Curated annotation (Swiss-Prot):
Keyword match Protein biosynthesis: yes
GO biological process entries: lysyl-tRNA aminoacylation
Chain location of the short sequence motif 'HIGH' region per the record: 72-80
Pfam families found in the cross-reference section: tRNA-synt_1f
Residues the entry annotates as binding ATP: K323
The protein's Enzyme Commission number: 6.1.1.6
Name of the featured protein: Lysine--tRNA ligase
Cellular localisation: Cytoplasm
A Gene Ontology cellular-component term: cytoplasm
Length: 552
């Protein structure tokens, strides 16, 4: 899909391409120790000859690993999804820059062997979780009764959503890696280099924590809980540690085979090393953790991955979105009110800027996505690679957009008091020749989202007001001009110009006060899209009737 794009991708400046270039540099640095080989391979890649670079340097034929991490302690939220979406965009840019001559994998890693530390606020059936506190998430009982464990339930929620978006990824479970032996060799290295890990971690801890900290968290053979206890003895030759169990007895367990897990910063480093991760991004709140894990990764003989720290998502009160609190939008929420493409667009925009993630952002994200999609076909090929829709759709955005914006659709729903898509299509089919749900599938989906959004957010907050004397006079004047137009007029620009002139004639300054008055008096809202577009699609006769009704 991405073959032959490297000449165009070479000059692309959107952030996924910048991250992909940094990843290429890391791959060359790690796999080709000789600087001359690095330079020669880079020259071939820059010249669009990555296939020749791979033939000349077989180390480049190994798959490049892109990873995203997920802690399934609560229900997945859109911030979790955003990391997968953004990492996918970097992976696609990498594939374009290398003409797919270097294989890639995207791992969605679930830290599901972590112990359940607290019961999420937004779960009704809390008792099983209360009783299983401290146990690995894949042992904690599922309060929903649908899966073998709470971790399995939340993993399934994440996978179902990612599958719904069509992401290409490999799901990897921490529990499977620990118990299946994939981490064993690196865990034995960690045991051998215990002191080097402690040298990184202890300065980051308080005095009391330093006294008992161990990078290894044994699983109690008696209670099944993940224990935060000191390591009393280490036996590198046997590959074991000794600790004091909850009943006071001393227990010796191997660090392999799922008998222990690592504290999360050493665990992150161990995972990077064991899996050979080349790229992983993370939130701004983890900057210090990335530094610590990077140092531990080096101590284990690995090389920290490339990546960057993105800004956090905030709820409407500027609080960080939390899986356990369940604040902010859920994945299901967004998909009730907006197209998946609009969500991906939102994730693409300025990842290093803090963003509010709540219901009000959906209409704006939807309309901006539609604008970018509409402009894509008119752009030069080189410019298309920096258009968000190229990244959203894996380089193949749909050729058909939507002739009606989401904001305009919302106003149509409001004016028509439409409760079904069939009612909306009565207006849309007259305004757009040949349009139907079959010929305009995106428009049909937007109609459904707009109805849901209107019913849940717009309708309950509508506040109509009577016009002032100035506004009444202007609306009567507009009424006369609309009545004078030929029946069936659908020229949005013509109507908009008439509305504009009426506002100027009646002395509205600034003119936006005139348009605001129209929406407040006619629709009970403080803002909306261009009034001319609304009147054209709603119909001149219906717009006249609406004005007459509100003027009494």
């Amino acid at each position: 899909m991405f073959e032959g794009l490297s000449p165009l991708a070479r000059d692309a400046r959107s952030w996924p391409f910048e991250q992909a270039r940094a990843t290429i540099a890391r791959v060359l640095r790690v796999r080709l120790p000789d600087r001359a080989d690095q330079d020669a391979a880079k020259a071939l890649i820059d010249a669009g000859k990555t296939d020749e670079a791979v033939k000349a340097y077989p180390a480049l034929a190994k798959a490049v690993i892109f990873e995203t991490g997920y802690g399934p302690s609560g229900l997945p939220h859109l911030g979790t999804f955003g990391e997968v979406a953004r990492t996918t965009m970097v992976r696609q840019a990498f594939r374009a820059l290398t003409d797919e001559a270097i294989p890639t994998r995207l791992i969605a890693f679930s830290d599901d062997m972590d112990g359940l530390r607290k019961v999420p606020d937004n779960i009704e059936n809390k008792q099983p979780l209360i009783e299983d506190l401290g146990k690995p998430l894949t042992v904690v009982r599922d309060p929903f009764g649908t899966h073998d464990s709470f971790g399995a339930h939340n993993n399934a929620r994440l996978r179902a959503f990612l599958d719904g978006f069509g992401f290409e990824y490999e799901f990897v479970s921490s529990t499977d890696c620990y118990k299946g032996g994939l981490f064993d060799a690196t865990l034995l290295t960690a045991l051998e280099r215990f002191d080097a890990i402690q040298k990184v971690m202890l300065p980051t801890l308080g005095e009391e924590r330093r006294a008992t900290y161990s990078p290894f968290l044994p699983i109690s053979p008696s209670t099944g809980k993940v224990l935060q206890v000191p390591t009393l003895e280490r036996n590198v030759e046997k590959g074991t540690i000794v600790f004091e169990d909850e009943d006071g007895s001393k227990v010796e367990v191997p660090v392999t085979g799922g008998h222990v897990k690592m504290q999360w910063k050493p665990d992150w480093a161990m995972r990077w090393t064991a899996l050979g991760v080349d790229y992983e991004m993370s939130g701004k709140d983890l900057i210090d953790s990335v530094k610590a894990s990077g140092a531990i990764c080096k101590a284990l003989g690995g090389v920290p991955p490339e990546g960057f720290n993105y800004e956090l998502f905030l709820d409407e009160n500027n609080q960080k979105i939390s899986k356990s609190k369940g604040n902010g939008l859920s994945m299901e929420d967004w998909l009730r009110y907006g197209a998946p493409e609009s969500l991906s667009y939102y994730m693409f925009q300025s990842p290093k800027s803090a963003k509010k993630l709540y219901f009000d952002v959906i209409p704006k994200a939807s309309d901006e996505y539609l604008q970018q999609l509409d402009g894509f076909g008119r752009q030069e090929p080189a410019k298309q690679l920096d258009n968000p829709v190229w990244h959203i759709h894996g380089g193949k955005p749909p050729q058909q957009g939507s002739p009606v914006s989401f904001s305009l659709m919302l106003n149509l729903v409001s004016a028509a008091d439409a409760s079904t898509k069939e009612i909306l299509w009565g207006f849309l089919s007259r305004y757009i020749p040949g349009a139907s749900p079959e010929t305009q599938p995106l428009l049909d989906r937007l109609a459904g989202y707009a109805i849901n959004y209107y019913e849940d957010f717009v309708k309950p907050s509508k506040v109509f007001r009577a016009p002032s004397d100035q506004e009444r006079a202007a609306m009567l004047d507009l009424l006369a001009k609309l009545k004078a137009m030929p029946a069936g007029t659908q020229d949005a620009e013509l109507i908009q110009n008439e509305v504009f002139e009426v506002g100027k004639t009646h002395g509205f300054d600034p003119l936006r006060a005139w348009f605001q008055a129209l929406y407040e008096v006619l629709l009970g809202q403080s803002q909306g899209p261009r009034f001319g577009s609304f009147a054209a699609i709603f119909g001149i006769d219906r717009t006249v009737a609406l004005i007459e009704e509100k003027l009494g």
